[in-house]
């Protein structure tokens, strides 16, 4: 079967487990919004993982609370697979196909520990500021880090994602970090670290408990850790990151609880669902038409301030 998943560490771990279980033999990495909007062809030969449900798929695995709200899963949708709230979609697949009996080596090597921590944002300030091992790999392989915006690598990020499926099944974490295609991305990540922090500070405004990071006027959005703002702004408990979408036709809002100040109570996934997006209680994203961006931003900001 063919896997359709997103290009992040959780998507990678899903691919590793599904290939280990003999379920898939090909892959397609996509943006979840494209799946939700019907822009990705889906057939009964496809396994959807960590992306919105599409009728007619062969298998579906997910862990986003907004999908259960969107589809009212218990009564209205029939599918093969599993969808339930979880720290990662990989953990849903892990449990579905036998847990430790089948996948013990991925507990032993630390991959499952890392994907649960990174995808749920269960990270310490030290892990954000000084990432090592699997946690570092989780940042390097996440499209939101921004390393894929550069085109001067030996191979593309999509090719590296494909190669990493084999690496994670056959190599130790230390060996993976020594792969030249991984090393050059690690080097870029650390070389831009201080400039990335400066960029975040220069484009952040604080509104009570909410930080708004508006990067629409930034010519080159540097690569960096998407959690760093929570270390830089410990008094705020939720962030809204604002960037241009494709061809500046829409604006993307990425909203998330602070992982260092865990006092926000708003349901982010449900809020994003109102704007055609989705997510979990603590994190989510949506895209809105450019002409409605300011109106939408103010409405989202009002909800987050009220739920702070």
Describe these PLM feature segments.
Residues 118-209:
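Hydrophobic, aromatic-enriched interface-forming segments
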């Amino acid at each position: 079967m063919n896997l359709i998943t997103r290009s992040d560490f959780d998507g990678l771990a899903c691919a590793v487990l599904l290939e280990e279980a003999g379920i898939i033999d090909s892959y397609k990495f996509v943006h979840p919004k494209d799946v939700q909007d019907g822009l990705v062809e889906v057939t009964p030969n496809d396994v959807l993982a960590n992306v919105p449900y599409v009728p007619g798929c062969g298998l579906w695995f997910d862990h986003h609370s907004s999908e259960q709200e969107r589809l009212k899963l218990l009564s209205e949708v029939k599918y093969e697979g599993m969808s339930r709230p979880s720290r990662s979609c990989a953990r849903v697949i892990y449990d579905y196909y036998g847990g430790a009996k089948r996948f013990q080596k991925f507990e032993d090597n630390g991959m499952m520990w890392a994907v649960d921590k990174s995808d749920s944002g269960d990270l310490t300030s030290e892990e954000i500021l000084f990432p090592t091992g699997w946690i570092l790999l989780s940042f390097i392989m996440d499209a939101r880090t921004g390393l894929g915006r550069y085109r001067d690598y030996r191979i593309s990020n999509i090719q590296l994602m494909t190669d990493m499926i084999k690496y994670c099944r056959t190599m130790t974490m230390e060996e993976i970090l020594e792969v030249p295609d991984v090393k050059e991305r690690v080097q870029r990540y650390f070389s831009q670290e201080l400039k990335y922090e400066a960029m975040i500070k220069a484009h952040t405004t604080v509104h009570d408990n909410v930080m708004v990071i508006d990067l629409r006027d930034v010519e080159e959005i540097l690569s960096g850790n998407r959690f760093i703002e929570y270390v830089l702004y410990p008094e705020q408990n939720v962030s809204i990151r604002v960037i241009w979408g494709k061809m500046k036709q829409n604006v993307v809002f990425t909203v998330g609880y602070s992982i260092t100040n865990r006092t926000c109570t708003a349901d982010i996934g449900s809020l994003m669902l109102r704007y055609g997006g989705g997510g979990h209680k603590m994190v989510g994203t949506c895209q809105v038409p450019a002409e409605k961006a300011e109106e939408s931003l103010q409405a989202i900001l009002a909800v987050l301030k009220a739920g702070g």
